[in-house]
Regions:
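Regulatory and interdomain segments flanking nucleotide-handling catalytic cores
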Residues: 1-233
């Protein structure tokens, strides 16, 4: 791409993310933007064949190759760790490996419930957006995001910033609302005056779980944030 390439790289990465999001969505999966050139997809219910199709279709459209590691675990964190391990076993990003679909011999697709928490900050527009400069809010949001990532990781969950003042956490099916309350308490002590609420959705795939979580969050908002946590099966 030459020396004047940074803007081209950003455009390419954005287009690849959009492509992958649409492809995984079409199979009821969801892609989270992690470090731009590394993405995490929740692909429960998606077959090996369809993972391969996504890789092949991407390479027909873009001047890059892509590799995927598929992990399975008792918790989202354990699944992600396994996905990284099976991919690393095929060669690092600096090796001669160009593309691979790696998994550990599990029966795929994985069929089972997915649990998602949609978290946001109460009255964020009034207490932050309308008062402070954007960049100050951006810094504080990232500090809060780091706290949530670290605390959700402790219970085996993955947490991602989802724009605005919204965070999506892919949670273990065993997670109890009391664990979420503990995470909120820790967050609110560190990031005053912010208070959190969350809708929790459980579905047969991640899109269904997110949809149910969104419905719960909407109901909490309509109740003027009197409830902190609501769950919908």
């Amino acid at each position: 791409m030459g020396n004047n390439r940074e803007h081209k790289i950003q455009i390419l990465l954005s287009e690849i993310f959009i492509f992958l999001q649409k492809k995984f969505n079409s199979h009821r999966g969801f892609v989270f933007l992690a470090s731009r050139d590394n993405l995490i997809a929740v692909s429960n219910g998606i077959s090996i064949k369809n993972h391969k199709l996504i890789i092949n279709e991407l390479e027909k459209q873009f001047p890059v190759t892509v590799s995927m590691g598929i992990g399975v675990g008792e918790t989202p964190i354990k699944a992600q760790i396994e996905a990284s391990k099976v991919l690393s076993a095929k060669g690092s990003a600096q090796s001669s490996r160009k593309k691979v679909l790696a998994y550990n011999g599990h029966k795929i697709p994985i069929i089972g419930e997915v649990k998602v928490a949609h978290v946001d900050i109460n009255f964020y527009t009034k207490i932050a957006t309308d008062i402070y400069p954007f960049y100050s809010n951006y810094i504080n949001l990232n500090k809060g995001y780091t706290t949530l990532m670290e605390d959700f990781q402790k219970i085996g969950a993955l947490c991602f910033f989802n724009g605005g003042d919204n965070f999506l956490s892919v949670c273990p099916n065993s997670m109890q609302p009391s664990e979420l309350k503990s995470i909120f308490k820790s967050f609110e002590l560190k990031h005053k005056p912010w208070k959190l609420k969350a809708g929790i959705g459980i579905g047969k795939n991640i899109l269904e779980a997110i949809s149910k979580a969104n419905i719960c969050l909407k109901e909490i908002r309509e109740g003027n944030n009197q409830e902190k946590i609501m769950l919908k099966n």
